[in-house]
Regions:
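C-terminal ends and interior cores of transmembrane alpha-helices
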Residues: 91-105, 333-347
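Central cavity-lining transmembrane alpha-helices of secondary-active solute carriers
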Residues: 60-75, 297-310
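Juxtamembrane intracellular "pre-TM" segments in multi-pass secondary transporters
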Residues: 3-13, 201-259, 283, 457-465
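A membrane-interface helix-boundary motif in multi-pass transporters
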Residues: 169-184, 287, 324-327, 408-428
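Helix-loop-helix hairpin linking two adjacent transmembrane segments in secondary transporters
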Residues: 149-202
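Cytoplasmic membrane-interface "Motif A"-like loop-to-helix N-cap segments
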Residues: 79-90, 315-332
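Cytoplasmic helix-loop-helix junction between adjacent transmembrane helices
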Residues: 114-155
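Extracytoplasmic gate region of multi-pass secondary transporters
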Residues: 37-38, 247-308, 363-367, 371, ...
Length: 498
């Protein structure tokens, strides 16, 4: 008869809002670091004697590396200690970012390599952080959790633009060097917070949702070593595992349609976010500081309330019908694209800002619902790979080309970003159509996830019952000849999280 190995019950904790804030701070630091370059781009162009296209390549290199690395990073996020991994990566990217401040002005290629390498950082923190949030918070709280995460991302974006725009012109135009050092100290602080954050067991929020519990399981033990049989064997296993994970993800209809929709929308959003300050400077005749300040204010004043409202709506409406997770983003993106297109019609700055503020608010309202919807549709053990695929689609097939394509179109019309935006913006409606197609599948896909959770909980209860029975037998008999039953005087070695 096959012998069953008993396992101790998991360690439990009540979940507060703190984990969602810590994960959000990682996006704040990342957004600040990215947009410091955007804020001081005029000084960087002057120092290295390059044009808008070269700056577009600088942005695209980061995005492209991010997209390429994010899928294997998502694969690893499903297998390693995510909170510790984020802490280590944030320390490294803070140091690498500062290296950009000492690059000689004759070596634009070196600056390009440094900025591109930072794409590795977000490629790790995004799928890992999103996976952690999905394991800390159940369906009814995920919208709020992802809204906090995204709000802090917009705060970082605004801070980066403001810092870059303010520091860049200092020291006779060499202030851009100092801007690269700004993120070191806050980066180290956030890394420490991630290191101290408990690692939740995978799928614990889903199990708590099914059992109507307010306690979450904390992963016991350390992650298994990544290279127990050598690096070559690890690479082979990772490639095979990625193929299986991607095949599983693409077999989920909700994920298929959502990934296409996200890539299309990501292209438009990145195009606007990268070059909007140039639109203010060239078409509305603002100074560099005013242009970066305007866009930073737009991101914060529109992004934060939009994201909070979107998260609240996502959590409220998902209780009525699961399809709300993809319907809400579709409607929000369509409204946003329409408002932005009207804002590009020649008119005074005041109406332009109001239209874009409402458009930004509508666009950001879609993010919590969309991320929560992907969490609902993807199995817990594949959420890292799922968010990796989400980033891969939005980055490689969408965002990476946006800065270069937009600047190239603008140059064809005499550096007219108004015309470039009017050409690009209608593409967003194609993305909304694909997101709407996901509506008919998300309820079935989410139901399959919870069905698997119920089966896993039944298996876990059997293991815990066996563990309790063995302890009782050991106590009654005063000893055991069964070597699989551990002495009560010895610590029980917990199983690693899988």
């Amino acid at each position: 008869v096959a012998e069953t190995t008993a396992v101790p019950p998991p360690r439990l904790m009540k979940v507060t809002n703190w984990p969602m804030w810590v994960i959000g701070f990682t996006l704040l630091i990342d957004g600040m670091d990215q947009y410091i370059v955007r804020g001081s781009s005029d000084q960087i162009k002057h120092a290295f004697h390059v044009g808008d296209t070269a700056i577009g390549v600088l942005f695209s290199a980061f995005i492209l590396v991010n997209g390429i690395v994010t899928l294997p990073a998502g694969y690893l996020a499903d297998r390693w200690n995510r909170t510790k991994a984020m802490a280590v990566v944030i320390v490294l990217w803070s140091i690498i970012s500062a290296m950009g401040g000492i690059v000689p002005t004759s070596a634009f290629g070196l600056l390009l390599v440094i900025r591109a390498s930072l794409g590795f950082g977000q490629a790790v923190t995004d799928p890992s952080g999103s996976s952690v949030i999905a394991d800390f918070y159940g369906t009814e709280r995920r919208g709020k959790a992802f809204s906090i995460q995204q709000c802090l991302s917009y705060v970082g974006l605004g801070m980066g633009l403001a810092i870059g725009g303010a520091i860049g012109p200092l020291f006779h135009g060499d202030g851009w060097r100092l801007a690269f050092f700004v993120s070191i100290v806050p980066g180290l602080i956030v890394a420490y917070m991630c290191w101290k954050l408990p690692e939740p067991s995978r799928g614990t929020a889903d199990r708590a949702h099914v059992s109507q519990s307010d306690e979450m399981e904390i992963a016991s033990g350390e992650s298994p070593p990544l290279f127990p049989h050598g690096f070559r064997k690890f690479l082979g296993d990772m490639v095979d595992g990625l193929r299986k994970d991607v095949r599983t993800i693409l077999n989920i209809p909700t994920m298929r349609y959502a990934l296409v929709g996200v890539s299309v929308v990501g292209f438009v959003v990145t195009a606007v976010a990268t070059w909007m300050p140039n639109f203010y400077q060239d078409q509305l005749h603002q100074s560099q500081q005013a242009a970066t300040g305007t866009f930073g204010a737009l991101a914060i004043l529109g992004g934060i309330p939009g994201t909070i409202i979107g998260g609240w709506i996502a959590d409220r409406w998902v209780q009525k019908f699961m399809g709300a997770r993809v319907v809400i983003p579709s409607v929000c993106i369509a409204v946003s694209a329409t408002l932005f297109m009207f804002s590009f019609i020649p008119m005074p700055f005041g109406p332009v800002f109001v239209l874009q503020l409402l458009g930004f608010m509508s666009a950001t309202a879609c993010v919590p619902a969309l991320r929560a919807g992907l969490s609902d549709a993807a199995p817990a053990h594949l959420r890292g790979a799922g968010f990796g695929a989400f980033n891969l689609a939005s980055v490689v097939f969408g965002s990476a080309a946006a800065p270069i394509v937009t600047s190239a179109i603008a140059e064809q019309f005499g550096n007219n970003y108004r015309t470039a935006f009017l050409i690009i913006m209608p593409v967003a409606f194609v993305g909304t159509a694909f997101l709407l197609l996901a509506r008919t599948h998300i309820e079935k896909d989410a139901a399959k996830v919870f069905e698997a959770v119920v089966m896993a909980m039944a298996a876990q209860q059997s293991e815990e019952a066996a563990y309790a029975a063995e302890l009782a037998a050991r106590s009654n008999n005063g000893g055991s000849a069964n070597p699989s039953v551990q002495s009560l005087d010895e610590p029980v070695e917990p199983k690693g999280d899988t």
